[in-house]
Amino acid sequence: LFLGCRTGAVAYAEVDPTDRCSPLVEVARWAKPAEIEGSFVGVNMTPDGRLVLSTDHGWLISLARDFSDHVAVRLPGADTDAADHCARMEAERGNTGYGWVRTSMCCDETGGVYISSVDHTHRVVWTGERFSLDEADGAWSAPYRNGTGRGSGTTPSLMGFGPDEDRFVVIGDGDEVVNITLFWRDRIPDDWEQLPGAPSRRIAGLGPAYMGDLTRVAIQTEQSITVSGYGAMTVNNEPGSLPD
């Protein structure tokens, strides 16, 4: 069992693997090197079994499960924007919950790692030895709508899996009324035209989640979009009322 924590990762195992009631004990701990900035906010696993972790300052780390080696890369834009954004959000809000990256990531079967920064969603490709940001390897970065300036609060979700299916990655964007937003995971179809109101041609669909009430002016979600087939569902985390 692996858990991500603020400054690293922790491995746990059963005292007696043959006993289903055996207690868990910590067996190893990995601390991030000083050059990897920020706090960890996400953890997942690539198809080869390596852990992948993300920090709020835009670092992505691939970590061997025995903690013997790691590979790190910065997301596009992190070197110029992440530290300032994190400092500004902490000053404005009094906490570090609205970092340049503030959600976890999802991984597909080909090594694609999908993660959102404050105004872009990225596909970074794990080759088995390194992270690639190269379009030739299938990597991309695409902007999404971000009227609040706080970015997406949803960990990306995959939609479409069959060899002949359209394949998307789905987020809730950063507008005041959150839009469920689909990106083409793979190559954008040649005849695809950029949608009205979409800041990127990679966006395959978007629509506001009004929750059945078109008069609502603020709807936010902090959960991953729930996907079933090509259907998607979200919740509203805006409180129905506030104390005086």
Per-segment meaning from a language model:
Residues 22-35, 69-96, 138-146, 204-215:
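A short beta-strand motif characteristic of beta-propeller blades
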Residues 1, 33-48, 82-107, 150-158, ...:
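Repeated scaffold domains used in trafficking and secretory/extracellular systems
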Residues 105-216:
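Long, internal scaffold/assembly segments composed of regular secondary structure
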Residues 8, 16-19, 45-51, 58, ...:
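Elongated scaffolding segments in large macromolecular assemblies
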Residues 5-17, 57-66, 118-127, 176-185, ...:
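Structural motif
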Residues 1-5, 48-55, 61, 111-116, ...:
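Short beta-strand elements that form the blades of beta-propeller/WD-repeat-like
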Residues 2-13, 25-64, 72-73, 99-106, ...:
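Mobile, glycine-rich extracellular loop/lid and propeptide segments
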Residues 49, 57, 67, 79, ...:
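Intrinsic-disorder/low-complexity loop/linker signature
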